[in-house]
């Protein structure tokens, strides 16, 4: 099967936005106008084609980036739909990695919202050229130029207005195209916004249009590489439409400007002009910067993988999904060469061979089977066994590893218990499949309680995963409250004598020990020293004492949490020829240790998290006050891209519910990350609560 479109006629784009900016509706309209979709799905009634998992339809938010292919002006456009909720940032990171360009959707009323800041940071990190689509121009309070100001001030972006809105709110009827200097007006009586026409700019808009066109030309002629434009412009010569378009494209691809256009997807205006801009200004795989990687055999040797059809196959797996009909789908972006179904490839990240079964081109939820996939394309492969997100698949003739993505560590854990025995087995399978799909989700077993602990990026993240276990894998599970792993230790050294003696007719029990118990540095662990002189405790009874001490350590002193950082020395004792046994000395060791520790100023330790909050300056005071309320200590402050960074150490037990609290405290404009740092002593009043709770 030959290529349907030349490599330079392909566009791989993502549509990224804040939750509720209207991203899914925009994608739906794109599919409708490009002729793939016949009845438009609205998110409001939960029927959008792109939102193909049940939970997304219920919550009205997009969770998994479905990949879809469509065509406009003879170009193939592959769209990756990205989620807009903070807990799903991993999905956005993932799709940013494989895109060549992006459309950022902003709400004309809400403007720049917190998630837009996060998505914008990721876009800059991965260097993805973008357009801005200001959606919902028909809504009360819509203000296109206010959104432009916010992008400049809040996101430190460089928006380039290429179209102005004609009217706003219910009077929004079209756009002024500043490149052609024409109005584009949608016909009021045409069905679904399918007809629109060009006309001359009305007199009352002429002056504004000329001022913005001036700004547009200035904006693109200041860019390196566009010097000829600058000269013509300075000499007052008229620039041709082609020159302006080439200038916008060059400035966009080099990340100097972000072209901006208005519209309303819901009311079917401005989507066709957005598609035109995608084709004209966003890069094809050939124009996008080539992807870098390393040699599989030697990761110090860097290689550049140019986008081309000839050359050995190289691709990146960016998403794994479980499909009810075909099993596991691995979404790949091909960077070089081509791949045929039925062939073998090398997973160079894991150094394993894989056999490719079928290859699918996805259209949101419908799929088309193809026999071959080429450079620059995005498709789903069936049949891979060992490939996970971020792995490289390549030919074994040129073994490259494309750069891996960075995945954040989970920040919240809960225990899950299967409701029945039957659920137990299914739960294990379900959790391992979900973990393969989502690298920011971890599963482990708590050695102390034997419970299954799941960890993820936020409370909503875990809620949705438990919900998917129920729906897709039919596993019923009880979810516990988030848990903290405390520890215990002592603060002063003591000497303790303990005699275990039992006499009840026949053979008795006798073990007698003198222990020195000493606190040690954090992280020391445990040490047992045998300092017995003159055989007062026979050799064979020494290890049982050690074993008894360790069993007592595991049981804890005050609240039943494991004891750590102690040194125990056995320095004296006595024994009885008949009544002494290993058991007697083990019990003497464990009871002696327990009683000794109770006199050694025992304390409870809690995990301290290193927390970093990125917050706009106006909310910094609230965030710092809140850290203090959570028993945290601020360790430093910093600046980053117009925001403040607050670094602090906060007890894990005080961080539950933090993402929700932080969101409401900062109108959702702050983001945070946390990781475990060290254990620290719990204050007296908190320790008292922990002990009472454990012993009740």
Swiss-Prot record:
Q: Name one GO biological process term.
A: ribosome disassembly
Ranges for domain tr-type G come to 8-286
UniProt-annotated location(s): Cytoplasm
Known Pfam families for this protein? EF-G_D2, EFG_C, EFG_III, EFG_IV, GTP_EFTU
Q: What GO annotations for molecular function exist for this entry?
A: GTP binding; GTPase activity; translation elongation factor activity
**Top-rank lineage group of the source organism:** Bacteria
GO annotations of cellular component type = cytoplasm
**What UniProt keywords apply to this chain's record, in alphabetical order?**
Cytoplasm, Elongation factor, GTP-binding, Nucleotide-binding, Protein biosynthesis
Question: What SMART domains does the annotation carry?
Answer: EFG_C, EFG_IV
What functional role does this protein have?
A: Catalyzes the GTP-dependent ribosomal translocation step during translation elongation. During this step, the ribosome changes from the pre-translocational (PRE) to the post-translocational (POST) state as the newly formed A-site-bound peptidyl-tRNA and P-site-bound deacylated tRNA move to the P and E sites, respectively. Catalyzes the coordinated movement of the two tRNA molecules, the mRNA and conformational changes in the ribosome.
| Family designation | Belongs to the TRAFAC class translation factor GTPase superfamily. Classic translation factor GTPase family. EF-G/EF-2 subfamily.
Which HAMAP family would you find in this protein's record? EF_G_EF_2_B (MF_00054_B)
Q: Would you tell me the protein name for this molecule?
A: Elongation factor G
Q: What is the lineage of its organism?
A: Bacteria, Pseudomonadati, Campylobacterota, Epsilonproteobacteria, Campylobacterales
